[in-house]
Amino acid sequence: MSVEKQTAMRRTFAIISHPDAGKTTLTEKLLLFGGAIQLAGTVKSRKAARHATSDWMELEKQRGISVTTSVMQFPYKDYLINLLDTPGHADFTEDTYRTLTAVDSALMVIDAAKGVEPRTIKLMEVCRLRHTPIMTFINKMDRDTRPSIELLDEIESILRIHCAPVTWPIGMGKYFKGIYHLIEDAIYLYQPGKHERVGESERIEGINNPELDKKLGDLASELRNEIELVKGASHPFEREGYLKGELTPIFFGSAINNFGVGELLDAFVKEAPPPQGRETNSRLVKPEEEKFSGFVFKIQANMDPGHRDRIAFLRIASGQYQKGMKAYHVRLKKEIQINNALTFMAGKRENAEEAWPGDIIGLHNHGTIQIGDTFTQGERFKFTGIPNFASELFRLVRLKDPLKQKALLKGLTQLSEEGATQLFRPLDSNELILGAVGLLQFDVVAYRLENEYNVKCVYESVNVVTARWVICDDKAVLERFNQEQSRNLAYDGGGHLTYLAPSRVNLEITMEKWPEIQFSETREH
């Protein structure tokens, strides 16, 4: 099959939500509808602990939050879907942000009782920057919820995006009876308790069908009146607005009961964009180009406790990956052979024989691959727009057993390569300082150091409030700066000079004193 045909059948997207809106449940149900798993909730770990397929790291299982981005591929009808599960917890902004650079569209999950929550607002800002098309699933309709019109108003006013309802709920909570599909003019009736298997919902054709009155009684005429109001007050779905990220189609349902998910998935494969062109520092790369290219948006250490491995997740931007092919690693200016790239089904990994634009493959990484790296078939361009953020929180890392210094350094280096934490090594001392965007990161690192590297560490406070990357073209100025400010300077994991400011005032004074130097909050990988 040609590159064009392979590209056209693919959909690569991420699910975004506030914690507890039901993102992991919906992820699992999408896999269920795609036939990737047979029974919901039955994927067991060796200890037979029940946990959702996509939250596969020990700490995630204990805490019930998605800590790292998981990649899952599954077929649905004539399509192949690549689903990137993003961390729902507030501390994992960076990882989520980078994941959103690797997708062509997003699915937003909203809890019908809570509406728009802070984390959703933050993620929407990222999507807006990239004009990412967004579909919305309003979940938990089987519980007591806020009025649906109110939820739409809130999405429009807070997230600044037009809402186009595609399905509309009939009742809510105990009185939830189903959904009306505005485009199909059909009603799907709700039967609670279908948690584990996918079954066909009973369907009634036409809102004016007398059969509806038999099934719903007085609710039928209420529904007809409500739909008239909804059609008058909301935007009709139009694909162009959706693809520009200006309008979001809205679907209602109950993911835990498998209800409303099929309608969402059908609309998704039909309307969501296939893999799109990608910007580089020299030109736009189109997916249908013959030559292979791709970029690394995430690195994950120790995905399989049985193998001490690091996997670099690469999004294919153009051409075809074939097992054993040679690819050019642009940053290192050298050709490498890729023999054993992986594809993923949440923790189940298989060797990829081939992969196409939109697919995510895993490359075994022995420390040479970094986030943001570009691979091509000889061309020397670099994909742009994969950011690194300055840390906001800092801790000094101390060993409980001083003899484990080497293992500590190895662990911290490998874990910081994943991009969720940053390791700083001060110029003036042998201290190790860990920086993160959120507090939970420190717990994750301590937990993983102990479990994956057999190193116990403790944290101490350190006199650093923020970090800035130091950029200066004038070597003489930079040398003078290094000498005068060495006590506040460190190298990050990538060997980039960083200023660790003991206070905001100190940073402002230093920036004023050194106008030739750029103090940057973000850095492109």
Curated annotation (Swiss-Prot):
GO biological process, one term: regulation of translational termination
InterPro entries in the cross-refs: EF-G-like_DII, EFG_III/V, G_TR_CS, P-loop_NTPase, PrfC, RF3_C, RF3_dom_3_sf, RF3_GTP-bd
GO MF annotation, one: GTP binding
A GO cellular-component term linked to this record: cytosol
Compartments, as annotated in UniProt: Cytoplasm
Signal peptide as annotated in the record: none
UniProt keyword terms in alphabetical order: Cytoplasm, GTP-binding, Nucleotide-binding, Protein biosynthesis
Xref: SUPFAM superfamilies: EF-G C-terminal domain-like, P-loop containing nucleoside triphosphate hydrolases, Translation proteins
Domain tr-type G: 8-276
Residues at which GTP binds: 17-24, 85-89, 139-142
Family: Belongs to the TRAFAC class translation factor GTPase superfamily. Classic translation factor GTPase family. PrfC subfamily.
Function of the protein: Increases the formation of ribosomal termination complexes and stimulates activities of RF-1 and RF-2. It binds guanine nucleotides and has strong preference for UGA stop codons. It may interact directly with the ribosome. The stimulation of RF-1 and RF-2 is significantly reduced by GTP and GDP, but not by GMP.
Name of protein: Peptide chain release factor 3
Organism: Coxiella burnetii (strain CbuK_Q154) (Coxiella burnetii (strain Q154))
